[in-house]
Every structure is written in structure tokens, then in C-alpha cells.
A protein has these predicted regions:
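Membrane-embedded helix bundles of polyisoprenyl
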Residues: 3-9, 94-108, 116-200, 220-240, ...
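Membrane-interface coil-to-helix junctions
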Residues: 6-102, 124-146, 243-248, 256-274, ...
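A cross-kingdom signal targeting lumenal/periplasmic-facing segments of multi-pass membrane
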Residues: 77, 486-626, 697-701
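Extracytoplasmic/lumenal acceptor-recognition loop(s) of multi-pass membrane glycoenzymes
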Residues: 58, 414-438, 455-529, 563, ...
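Transmembrane alpha-helical segments
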Residues: 101-109, 148-160, 188-196, 283-287, ...
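Periplasmic/ER-lumenal interhelical loops and adjacent helix-loop junctions
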Residues: 213-329, 371-378
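Active-site-proximal, structured, solvent-exposed surfaces of multi-pass membrane proteins
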Residues: 35, 615-846
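Contiguous transmembrane helix-bundle modules in multi-pass membrane proteins
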Residues: 182, 296-309, 316-444, 808-846
């Protein structure tokens, strides 16, 4: 009970005054929002195994988002609480998971015959380890599997001592379903502990270990783990298929020799929230373990040391994408076990003095020599102090009975204190917890009612998006309020590659965030029209949109010229001709033509048609040199040096007759590539992230399309802090053609039938043409026209379409996530194996 209360108190204390136990961006836009969406879809469809997420990112394979808890038992419990906000539930669930992990770890250590003092202090060290509390409110998938991982360690003991497999298989299965990404490291840690327990069991039974016996017993143990993996097949197989279709995360360039050379990044490896997060005592224990008397104890220490220090394992556990210590977090319980073992041996004086002191000295010297490699001198001093204190305690306990009596507190007390200090420092430095006020605003049901009003007022197939400043947009990247609300934005580590490429390279949508994975709602009016964003929920006026209603959750704006999500047209141009179009024609063409494999018009014809609506214009940034801002024209652009962000007024041609659009594009060359650059035009922001950023966005071409109101003569340009060159600038003014006959026949969606992985409706067409959607293309689609299966093709460079003959038709679009059937079969086989094992065991018992 004391450990539970302490865990809850530590979590509440970490939030500070006026905050919630949840962070901005990742937690608020992913880890709390995706579970809400999964629950919404379950309520809407009743399907326990969904396949498609039509509502997010234009419409994508739902297994792109499985990382965020699609089948997590932690999330599934929330399905039983329909009147509770999923975000509220996830906060409570994270604290419960953390408390459960601490208690199970404590009980596991007690079952291994460690004293209550050793078990309790080690459990506290586990609680205050860098990632545990921090990630429970940030990226919860980093740690929320810990109760099941700790339970599986208990299952291994039970397997070797009682020959019972249930807890081993069940714990591994639940760990995988909770966080498949981190379960890989978890299984490796379980494997190391399994070898250790096997050897120890054989020793106690006074049995010899033979190669044949080890291989046979090892295969039987691995079979239990494999059974758990098979049980999780319904998650793992379709997720693997979805990940294979991802691009853009090709991983870091790696050198084989560097991967195989042991190394420790002290700042990331120790204390940090993105690694195991223990103190330098962990290194001392691993080194000391190499000198234990028993071979299996040496093997366990050596195995952990190799995995934790050789980058190859971190690289492998991160899916061969990069070398980051986050994949080593699952080794934390095993390190706690080794800590308890070390304290037991130290107290019973089973470690020779020289083997006790040498590792301490080695770590002290290593930390001292690494001073120049560490960014934080404060952390370096803390590490050095921590190592020196451990050294002094080890020396003192050899001569003092009193210190040996209170050895656990003497050794782990300073460690826990240092973990608390560094943890508090990390929380304060990050400063990214969501304030309670902002949280209540972001999750206010009034916004949901505004969305509902827009949806219920329109029987068509359109999108409704929520827009605000960039911070608010980041919070809402994946947020949908209604199962019939569809949005274009997305923030996920896995995504539809065609859609991502279209946004970035073909259409060139603005990139307001430093993380390339964050695909924001766009302020580009042409993109909004193309994607069928008919309604916007906003607190500010939106050019090109008419205010329809005022609500407590925001004003509802409407654009009657937005494209339907699906329609038929015979106005087409080929992909080859589209690729010849430059900016802004590569955007505006979508207001007049659909791009198909074989089109009817040329790039020259498109430019001629658009000439009456598009005009090249000057866009001259005012020259300035006042000691804070330096803006100097060059032959091909501007040289900019800003000590802080500053706003400029730039003259543009007046819109005399009606609202228009200003198109601006230029290249950016960062003179200080380790710093971010951001430039905003009329509030539309582009950002180039530091080349050192984990998810570098590569946004070196800034593209803008901003609405201009009738009579507007100037626009606001904000140049961000930094030193950079603007070059190859082009600017145009234009108007969006309101009289377009591109959308010749509109798809009438059946809202009752359209749910889950099914889109159904009718269309009436007088001419042959192409059925065009703004749903990203995927090979998993199966389409029928009047019950007859037809071949789908990619249209508009990234979206779903097919040929449609004249007449009245019933359209049915069904999505099958690749790998789902195979995954279900694998899970079924796993269930049969478990049943067969249970039956066999029962017969043997009889």
C-alpha cells in the first residue's frame, strides 16, 4: 500500500500546479486521441478487429496507428466506460499501470528471497528511473507494458519451478498487445533471464547441463514465447504489412564497425527519460557481475552489458532505423533484479574487495574522462558524485558493521535521491505538460457539438476540420469528434506513403512543424478545396469561407465550392503532363482537372486556361538594418540575419473584384543548420528544422498559398530568428474558379452503411469518366460497381479512383488491411496450441 500511495503522490507531484498528467503534442495529439478514435469506431461498427480509419489522414489503414494501443488491454478497458473521456481514462490508467508495475516488481523480488528492505528500495529505484514517471505522461507506450513484462518475469520463475506455462505465455502476449514495439526488447530481456533461471534451476537440482539438454529445453521455452507471439498474430502481421509500406523513415546511415564497438552515451543512457534511466550504479553492477563466482551469474551480467553497450542491439531493437537507447527500456526490471542481487552479495560479503572496488574506480575514471563529451556540466558533476559516493560506501562497508546493517539505504538512498533530482530537472526543463485550462478547452464537448452541427446540416460527403494557431493545430492533428467527421491531418510514425509524398513533393503543402511526421491541417485554400474541406471550426475569419453559425465551441465556416470527397468527371490530364507543371499551376490544376494515368489535356493548355486567373507579381521584402534585423536584397533573393523574429508588411496587388489567393514560393538556405528557421505569411507557417533533429523535415522549399480579401493591399510576413538566405522567389496572385464543372456527378454517400472499412453510396452520370476520390490510394481497396468488381487505380497522384461508365450506379468500396486474414489464422493456431497444451497437461495429471 505504501508503494502505491508513493507512486500516486509522485505522479501528482510531477504535474506541478495547474497541469494535468499529460504532455503537449505527443500525448495530447497521439497517445490520448487515438484510443478515443478506436473506441469511437468500435461503438459505431461493433467490429473488434477494425481495418480502416476513414476519418484520419484522408483515410488510411488503421494498422498504421496500431502502435498507439489498437488492441492494448489497457485501452480496451476504456471501451467499458462510454461516459468517461478517454483522455481522462488514459491519465488514470497510466498511473495505475505504473503502480501495478512497481508492486509486481516488488513481489517478484520478494519471491526471489530478497529482503523486504532490498525489494522495497529497489522498487523505489525502478519507480524513479528516468523513463517511468516521465513517459507515463508523455509517450506512454514506452512504459505502459511494464506490469505485463514484470509479470512475465514471475512467469519464467513459475515455469522453471512448477513447470507451468500459463503466466509466461499470458504475460508475454499481453506485453506484445500493449506495446509491440517495446516487446521485442522485452522478449530479449526475458530470454536472458530464462537462460539464467535455467542454469540456476539445474544447479539447485544438482543436474549437469548438456548441449543436447540445453537445446531441447531451450526450444521448449522458446516455444512458449513463440505461442504468445502467435496469439498476437492478429496485431503483429497486419502491423508488419503496414510498416513495410512506409517510406520517409529509411533510418540513419550507420557504419558496421561503429555498430559493433561498445559505447555509452552517458547523457542518454543514464538518468535520461529516453533510455533505461538508472544511475551510474548500473554500470558498476554490470562490471562487478563479470567477477561473480557462478558462471550463470556472469553470463547474465555479460549479456546485459553487451546488449546495453553494443549499438548493434539498439539498432536491431529499433527496427534497423536508428541507434537510440529507448529500445533498451525493457531491460529496466532485469537491471533492478541485478541491483538486488548485488546488494545481497555486498551485504553478505560475497564479493572480493578488489572486484568490488575495481568496477567503482573504472566507472569514476570513465565518467571523469567523458567530461568534454557531455553537454551538461551539471549532469556530469552529478554522475561523478554518484560514482564517488558509491565507491566510498563500498570501501566503508568493508570496515563498518553499522554501514553493512543499513547497506541497502546507504547504497540506494543516494541513487534514488539523484534520480529524483535529475527527474525533477528534466520535468522543469521540458516544461511541456498540458495546463488544465488548455486541456479543458481542447477537449470541450462544445467543440464536438459545433462539429456535429456542421455534419448534420449537410447530407453530402465532405470533411470538417478544426483550425487555430499552430500550437492548437498540433494538439488536434488526430482528433475527431464524431465518427462521421473526416480530416486531412495526421501525426503518426506510420502512414500512407503516397499521401505523405503528395503533400510534400507533388502539391507542396506548407510544413509548419519541425517533425516531418506531423502532417498538419493546411491553410492552403486550393488544398482544402481539393480535399473536400467544406467546413471549418475556427475562432477567426477564414478567407474563402462564409460564417454559417456561431457556437460556444467555435464559429462554423463553410465553403460551398469545396470538392466532394468522391465525384465523377471526364476533365482529366495525364500524370506525365502534370509533372511538367511548375508552381503554382501544380496546385491550381486540381480546381479544373483530375490527374489520371491517361489524360486529355496538356500542361500548356492548362497554363493557358489558368492565365486569366493567375498573374505573376512582385513580392519585395522591405530592406532593414537596425541592429536587430538585417534584410539585404541580393541578386537572387535576400540575405537575412535576425536576432529575434520580426514582422514586415509586404505590398501585394489589390484584389479589386473578389477574394483571391497569393502564392509565394522560395528556397531557404540555413547558414546555421543546427538551428531551426521559421517564416510565416499571413499566419501560414513554414519551418526548416535543425539537421540534428530526430525527425528532420527537410523543408528547404517554403511554399505558401494564403487567402486575400477583397481590397487587401498588404500581407504580414514574419521572419524568424536565425541567419539564412532566401532565393529563387516566385509570387503570383490568383482567384479560385467558382464556376468549375469539374465535379460533374457527385457521389451520394449512404451514411448509415458507410462505416468501418466500408464506403457505400450511389452516383448518377450522363457521360463516361473517372470516379475520383480524395482518399489516399492503397492496394487493400476492393471496389464494386453494381455488384461487379472493378480495378482501382491511382488518381491525382496519390488517391483512389476508377473508370466509371454513364448511368446510375451503386458504388461499394471495401478495404481489407493486408495481413489481417493471415494474422487471424496465426492467432487461431496459437489458441489451438494453448488449448492442446492445457488438455495434454490435464491428461498427464490424471
Amino acid at each position: 500500500m505504501a508503494l502505491i500511495l508513493l507512486t500516486v503522490a509522485a505522479c501528482l507531484y510531477s504535474t506541478g500546479a495547474g497541469n494535468i498528467f499529460g504532455a503537449k503534442v505527443d500525448w495530447s495529439s497521439q497517445h490520448s486521441v487515438f484510443p478515443e478514435y478506436f473506441r469511437q469506431q468500435f461503438y459505431r461498427t461493433g467490429q473488434f478487429f477494425p481495418e480502416f480509419a476513414l476519418n484520419i489522414g484522408g483515410g488510411q489503414n488503421i494498422y498504421n496507428f496500431s502502435y498507439y494501443g489498437l488492441f492494448s488491454p489497457v485501452v480496451l478497458i476504456g471501451y467499458l466506460l462510454p461516459n468517461v473521456k478517454m483522455s481522462d481514462y488514459m491519465m488514470v490508467a497510466s498511473i495505475v499501470c505504473l503502480a501495478a508495475a512497481v508492486i509486481i516488481l516488488y513481489r517478484w523480488l520478494k519471491s526471489r528471497e530478497f529482503t523486504a528492505a532490498v525489494s522495497g528500495m529497489t522498487a523505489l529505484m525502478f519507480l524513479f528511473a528516468g523513463p517511468m514517471i516521465y513517459q507515463s505522461s508523455h509517450q506512454i507506450m514506452f512504459v505502459n507494458y511494464m506490469p505485463f513484462l514484470c509479470l512475465t518475469f514471475c512467469g519464467i520463475d513459475r515455469y522453471f519451478e512448477q513447470k507451468k506455462s500459463g503466466l509466461l505465455i499470458g504475460g508475454t502476449f499481453l506485453m506484445i498487445m500493449t506495446s509491440f514495439y517495446f516487446s521485442i526488447g522485452g522478449i530479449l530481456a526475458l530470454g536472458l533471464y530464462g537462460i539464467y533461471r535455467y542454469a540456476r534451476t539445474k544447479e539447485r537440482a544438482e543436474e549437469m547441463i548438456t548441449v543436447k539438454g540445453f537445446l531441447g529445453d531451450g526450444l521448449r521455452f522458446a516455444g512458449r514465447i513463440l505461442t504468445a507471439i502467435m496469439l498476437a498474430g492478429v496485431l503483429l502481421v497486419p502491423t508488419a504489412m503496414a510498416l513495410l509500406g512506409r517510406s520517409g523513415s529509411k533510418g540513419e546511415k550507420t557504419d558496421l564497425w561503429q555498430l559493433l564497438t561498445p559505447q555509452i552515451n552517458l547523457e542518454k543512457f543514464l538518468y535520461g527519460a529516453y533510455g533505461p534511466g538508472l544511475s551510474c550504479l548500473m554500470l558498476i553492477i554490470l562490471l562487478t557481475g563479470l567477477f561473480y563466482k557462478k558462471a550463470y551469474e556472469k553470463i547474465l551480467s555479460l549479456g546485459c552489458l553487451v546488449v546495453l553497450t553494443v549499438p548493434f542491439f539498439s539498432y536491431l531493437l529499433n527496427g534497423a532505423l536508428y541507434v537510440r537507447p529507448k529500445s533498451l527500456i525493457p531491460f529496466l526490471p532485469l537491471m533492478c533484479y541485478l541491483t538486488a542481487k548485488y546488494l545481497e552479495k555486498l551485504k553478505n560479503q560475497k564479493i572480493g574487495r578488489i572486484w568490488m572496488l575495481l568496477p567503482c574506480l573504472a566507472v569514476v575514471i570513465y565518467i571523469y574522462l567523458k567530461k568534454d563529451d557531455m553537454k551538461s556540466e551539471v549532469l556530469w558533476k552529478l554522475l561523478l558524485l554518484d560514482a564517488v559516493i558509491t565507491l566510498l560506501i563500498c570501501v566503508a562497508q568493508a570496515y563498518s558493521v553499522w554501514i553493512r546493517k543499513y547497506l541497502t539505504v546507504a547504497v540506494l538512498g543516494p541513487v534514488i535521491l539523484s534520480l529524483i533530482i535529475t527527474g525533477s530537472y528534466s520535468w522543469e526543463k521540458s516544461g511541456n505538460l498540458e495546463s488544465r485550462k488548455a486541456y479543458e478547452e481542447d477537449t470541450s464537448r462544445a467543440i464536438g457539438k459545433a462539429v456535429d452541427k456542421a455534419i448534420t446540416s449537410d447530407g453530402g460527403f465532405y470533411r470538417v476540420e478544426q483550425v487555430g494557431n499552430e500550437e492548437k493545430n498540433a494538439e488536434n492533428l488526430n482528433r475527431v469528434w464524431n465518427s462521421e467527421q473526416y480530416i486531412t491531418s495526421l501525426y503518426s510514425s506510420s502512414y500512407n506513403a503516397d499521401y505523405q509524398n503528395f503533400r510534400k513533393n507533388d502539391f507542396q503543402v506548407e510544413q509548419p512543424y519541425r517533425n516531418f511526421l506531423m502532417q498538419s491541417v493546411s491553410q492552403n485554400p486550393v488544398f482544402r478545396q481539393l480535399m473536400g474541406v467544406k467546413y471549418l471550426i475556427s475562432s477567426q475569419n477564414v478567407p474563402g469561407y462564409e460564417k454559417k453559425w456561431m457556437t460556444r465551441g467555435g464559429d462554423v465556416y463553410c465553403n460551398e465550392n469545396a470538392a466532394p470527397i468522391a465525384y465523377k468527371t471526364n476533365q482529366t490530364m495525364s500524370e506525365a503532363e502534370y509533372d511538367r507543371l511548375d508552381f503554382p499551376y501544380n496546385q491550381l490544376v486540381f480546381t479544373r482537372y483530375a490527374v489520371t494515368k491517361d489524360g486529355t489535356v496538356s500542361a500548356e493548355q492548362v497554363k493557358e486556361e489558368l492565365a486569366e486567373d493567375v498573374e505573376k507579381c512582385d513580392f519585395r521584402i522591405p530592406e532593414k538594418n537596425n541592429g536587430i534585423s538585417l534584410v539585404v536584397p541580393t541578386e537572387n533573393g535576400y540575405q537575412v540575419k535576425m536576432k529575434k523574429a520580426q514582422e514586415f508588411e509586404v505590398a501585394v496587388p489589390e484584389q479589386e473584384e473578389k477574394d483571391g489567393v497569393l502564392f509565394v514560393q522560395f528556397r531557404i538556405e540555413n547558414k546555421k543548420p543546427k538551428k531551426d528557421i521559421e517564416i510565416s505569411l499571413e499566419g501560414e507557417r513554414n519551418k526548416l528544422s535543425s539537421i540534428q533533429h530526430m525527425y528532420y523535415n527537410g523543408n528547404t522549399v517554403f511554399t505558401y498559398a494564403v487567402g486575400l480579401e477583397k481590397g487587401q493591399k498588404t500581407v504580414r510576413l514574419s521572419l524568424g530568428k536565425g541567419e539564412y538566405t532566401i532565393k529563387d522567389m516566385s509570387a503570383y496572385t490568383g482567384v479560385l474558379n467558382e464556376g468549375t464543372d469539374l465535379y460533374q456527378s457527385v457521389f451520394r454517400v449512404d451514411k448509415e452503411q458507410t462505416k468501418g472499412n466500408l464506403i457505400q453510396g450511389r452516383i448518377k452520370s450522363q457521360k463516361d469518366g473517372m470516379f475520383i476520390t480524395s482518399i489516399p490510394f492503397d492496394k487493400g481497396f476492393e471496389m464494386t460497381i453494381d455488384g461487379v468488381k472493378v480495378k482501382c487505380e491511382k488518381v491525382n497522384k496519390a488517391f483512389l479512383g476508377f473508370h466509371l461508365e454513364a448511368g446510375k450506379h451503386k458504388i461499394r468500396i471495401l478495404y481489407h488491411a493486408p495481413g489481417v486474414t493471415a494474422g487471424k489464422i496465426l492467432t487461431g493456431l496459437g489458441v489451438l496450441i494453448v488449448i492442446a497444451g492445457a488438455v495434454r497437461k490435464k491428461k498427464c495429471a490424471e
